[in-house]
Design a protein with these regions (language model features):
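HIT superfamily nucleotide-processing domains
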Residues: 1-167
Length: 167
């Protein structure tokens, strides 16, 4: 690899995003209102929050936990929603460690477009599996991202674990 020149890996699902017409709507509100078919990528629905796959994941098993309400800030959510949010993040942690044998996780929120939020009007928490020696987040060090598992396989792996009442 030449310094300053990014490597390119094929990710066909990313191309779909780039060429698709943008609905202008909120992807989280749309997913919350959608049926539970695979197209929605919703893995779990709680009373106040839900879990869905990132359609353009950083790693295998990349989840997002979001409230049903269209809220830009944690401070906009009531205490019950925040309690369920944290509990669902903890449950997601246990499921991802069990399903993917992870060595760690990144958990984070970007508030506002200046902070990197792709959907600034509806906060969501990223839960991203990590492994010792993994090749992900290569974009930080080598301008490359590697994701070997397609989202439909991830959905088939994780949805049953959430519905079984696992961890």
């Amino acid at each position: 690899m030449k310094p300053g020149k990014p490597e390119v890996l094929f990710a066909p699902w990313r191309y779909e995003y780039l060429v698709a017409e943008k609905s202008g709507g909120c992807i989280f509100c749309e997913a919350a209102a959608a049926s539970d078919g695979d197209e929605s990528l919703v893995v779990y629905r709680g009373e106040r929050v839900f879990v869905l796959l990132n359609r353009y994941p950083y790693t295998n098993g990349h989840l997002m936990v979001a409230p049903y309400g269209h809220e830009a800030w944690l401070s906009s959510s009531d205490a019950e929603t925040l309690t369920e949010l944290i509990g669902t993040i903890a449950r997601s942690e246990k499921i991802l460690v069990s399903a993917y044998h992870t060595d760690g996780l990144n958990v984070g929120i970007n508030f506002g477009s200046a902070a990197g939020a792709g959907v600034a009007g509806h906060y969501h928490v990223h839960v991203v599996p990590r492994w010792n020696g993994d090749t992900n987040f290569m974009s930080v060090t080598a301008s490359t991202r590697v994701v070997p598992e397609v989202p439909s396989v991830t959905l088939a792996r994780l949805r049953p674990l959430f519905s079984e009442g696992s961890p």
